[in-house]
Amino acid sequence: SYVLAKSLNPETQVRALALTSLMDMRGGHVVFCAPEALAADVAMCETMQYRVGLSCAAYGGYTDAKLPGMRATREKLIRSLGLGLYSTIGSFSGALDQGKVFSPTQMILDQELHGFLARYATKQVVNEDALAIDEIVSIGWRPGGYLASEHTLRHMRDVWRSNVYGRTPWVSLEDEQGK
């Protein structure tokens, strides 16, 4: 399709998407979440970008997991973190079983993961306000000083918060019911 697009109009912008897999020789089935497949995606993106001059992204949203949950999320995280170093992080679609199944539950988990990765990939601001060295020196070791400072009040919501996973510590059922 690259040759066709360029032959029809040399100014046509063309992009590539890397999504490689390998065959598990024990069962003869395709595997997307293997280190070798990730390495092939990275190699494909680098070849397209640096040898061909073609913009290339790698898709991290495929999983070999059949059910929604932690395995699927872990596989997507592993693919995305590795590929995110070389490519853009695309959105996820709730796909399971190598894209053959859609799961609304997995889509919610995927959106959580995407929010986390987008925040992780955000360029961190490093300036006098962010470092707050003068404030740290002026507060020193006073008890409770940082929690009551203006700087903390201005920046306390600058952190990513999950809409699905809680940040509270584990509480036993008895303690939870006792409240």
Please give the residue ranges for each predicted region.
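Catalytic-core signal marking the mid-to-C-terminal active-site face
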Residues: T105-K179
